[in-house]
Amino acid sequence: MLLTPAATADASPMEQSFEGNPIVVINITYEAGIGGGSDIEGDIVLELFLNWAPITVTNFVGLVNESFYDGIFFHRVIDDFVIQAGDPTCTAVGVYPASDPSCGSNGSGETIPFEADANLTHINGALGMARSVDPDSASSQFYICDGPQHGLDN
């Protein structure tokens, strides 16, 4: 992942870009293998809302700056729901929850408290921190919404 200054976004509080917010660019490479398909490479650009989730943003940016996410797989990809990554043990080709149940259950070792803000909602492309049933259990795992997922709000 690369942290870079840039502008992004569209229009709802989260669909507007706010000057000074950190922008994270995730470079994705997919090499077709036994799953088939075509090789793909591209960037996912995320704006982080520092005013609405300062602890979460500081944690995420810190992990990016430490290269924590480099080489980590998206271990959960569910069409019309989310794509999820951030488990440091999910780095070997072919290691996914189906073949290694521990893949997808680990994190950075540090947890952060849940931050709620009325402006934060699970719109298409929204970034969220994965957590267990304990609201204060987020660590390094994150997801990106594939379509609106308002059932995940709060």
Whereabouts are the PLM-identified features?
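Cyclophilin-like peptidyl-prolyl cis-trans isomerases
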Residues: L2-N154
